[in-house]
């Protein structure tokens, strides 16, 4: 590996040409592995959970807001699914979804319009997967009810809002032996997937520190009276502090660090700035008659959370949806032999010349070599179908592929619980003056049963 690093730095053009000419096999694809029964885990856990194959996955989409409508447009591009039910309390959105599906699916799904119709959907016996895209407060209740009625669940982020809800998800998934995952699309960003494969090939040596974020100026959308139903997202900023949306930044880093697959998050400290931006925006942009003008918001503009793992690694997470600045998830990875960062621009630096980043052309070449073969095979379609640059389609594709073939899913219920728990735990630390807060081990001492993150193939 040291020779490879040296060769990459000083003779990268020849290195890339040699690897690209080897079309038979991507010898650097460590992330996607063929499943076999030696990967089975104890029956009392949901680690590497295996369920019967489903040839055609019958899906109910609950919640047809922004994410739900995008799913309605993407999912029919996968031939082994059928949407059999859709639900939203806004009849206009239901009818819009039906019109969209009329062009992509022969049999239209049964529409549901009432507030509690999600329970009727979960009670049906002709549904395999409940795809939850509602506002956050309904994520856990629907997921629990669905699993209790023999359904797999894919729930938008965050999967839960409290540690207690996280435990409910874990215990229900273990008891019912049903998949329960978050629809964390950032796991499938081309750069982040390739970086994960690079780390698994030891290109950076031992990873020591990582940084992630959700930095996204949402002021105009949050104060819109139409974009988020009933201003549910703005109300969260009014009512709570800490990191209220951690999973986009944390998810890819957690897999990169093999969290609950050889390491675990141990404890955190969290600190928030005071709140300035929302008040200023409301005063500057809203009409005097707007009900939100003059409101107080608990959420500080910038939250920074530091996490320590059992193996001595550190994670920095940031959350800011109120500042006028470019979008960023940071995605910074620092190891003993090199460095990767996506934002503000892709950067790769490796020993022995790590003081300098490779050029953009060289970075593209490195990414070409280490992009997993499985992703290369579906990349063209993913880019065509779209969804945040294609990562949403890859997320759906991998979910359905694993259900079709009876494989463990790329994410599991412990991921959902660990990443979502940061919401309440960071809030607790902020309120205590940034005292240390312990992070629960949702696997209950099974965090080192597996030794790495793997995405499985048949």
Feature-to-residue mapping (PLM):
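ADP-ribose/adenylate-binding Rossmann-like module
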Residues: 150-162
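Bacterial Sec-dependent N-terminal signal peptides
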Residues: 1-21
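N-terminal glycine-/serine-/threonine-rich beta1-alpha1-beta2 phosphate-ribose binding loop
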Residues: 19-149, 167, 171-179
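Predominantly a Rossmann-like dinucleotide-binding segment in NAD(P)-dependent oxidoreductases
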Residues: 176-181, 186-297
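C-terminal helical cap and adjacent loop that interface with cofactors, partners, or active-site loops
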Residues: 20-42, 47, 70, 324-458
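Active-site beta-strand termini and strand-to-loop segments that position acidic
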Residues: 305-311, 335
């Amino acid at each position: 590996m040291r020779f490879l690093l040296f060769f990459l730095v000083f003779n990268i053009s020849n290195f890339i040409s040699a690897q690209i000419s080897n079309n038979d096999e991507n010898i650097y694809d460590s992330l996607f592995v063929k499943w076999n029964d030696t990967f089975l885990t104890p029956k009392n856990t949901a680690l590497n959970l295996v369920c019967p194959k489903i040839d055609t996955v019958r899906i109910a989409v609950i919640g047809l807001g922004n994410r739900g409508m995008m799913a309605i447009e993407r999912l029919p591009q996968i031939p082994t699914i059928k949407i059999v039910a859709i639900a939203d309390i806004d009849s206009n959105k239901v009818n819009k979804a039906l019109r969209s599906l009329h062009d992509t699916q022969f049999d239209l799904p049964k529409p549901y319009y009432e507030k509690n119709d999600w329970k009727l959907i979960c009670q049906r016996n002709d549904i395999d997967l409940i795809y939850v895209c509602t506002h956050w407060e309904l994520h856990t209740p629907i997921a629990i009810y669905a699993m209790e009625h023999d359904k797999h669940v894919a729930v938008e982020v965050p999967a839960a809002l409290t540690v207690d809800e996280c435990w409910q998800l874990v215990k229900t998934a273990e008891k019912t032996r049903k998949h329960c995952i978050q629809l964390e699309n950032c796991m499938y960003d081309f750069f982040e997937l390739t970086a994960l494969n690079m780390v698994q090939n030891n290109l950076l040596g031992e990873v020591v520190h990582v940084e992630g974020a959700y930095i996204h100026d949402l002021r105009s959308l949050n104060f819109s009276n139409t974009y988020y139903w009933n201003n549910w997202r703005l109300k969260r900023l009014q009512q709570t502090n800490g990191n209220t949306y951690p999973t986009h930044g944390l998810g890819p880093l957690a897999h990169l660090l093999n969290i609950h697959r050889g390491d675990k998050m141990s404890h955190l400290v969290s600190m928030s700035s005071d709140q300035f931006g929302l008040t200023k925006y409301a005063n500057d942009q809203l009409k005097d008659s707007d009900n939100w003008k003059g409101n107080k918001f608990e959420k500080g503009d910038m939250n920074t959370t530091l996490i320590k793992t059992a193996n001595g690694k550190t994670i920095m997470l940031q959350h800011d949806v109120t500042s006028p600045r470019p979008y960023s998830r940071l995605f910074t990875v620092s190891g003993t032999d090199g460095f990767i960062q996506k934002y503000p621009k892709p950067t790769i630096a490796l020993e022995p010349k790590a003081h300098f980043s490779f050029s953009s052309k060289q970075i593209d070449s490195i990414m070409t070599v280490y992009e997993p073969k499985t992703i290369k095979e579906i990349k063209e379609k993913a880019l065509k179908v779209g969804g945040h640059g294609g990562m949403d389609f890859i997320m759906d594709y991998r979910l359905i592929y694993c259900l079709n073939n009876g494989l463990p899913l790329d994410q599991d219920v412990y991921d959902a619980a660990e990443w979502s728990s940061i919401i309440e735990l960071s809030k607790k630390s902020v309120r205590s003056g940034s005292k240390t807060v312990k992070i629960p081990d949702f696997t209950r001492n099974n965090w080192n049963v597996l030794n790495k993150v793997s995405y499985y193939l048949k």
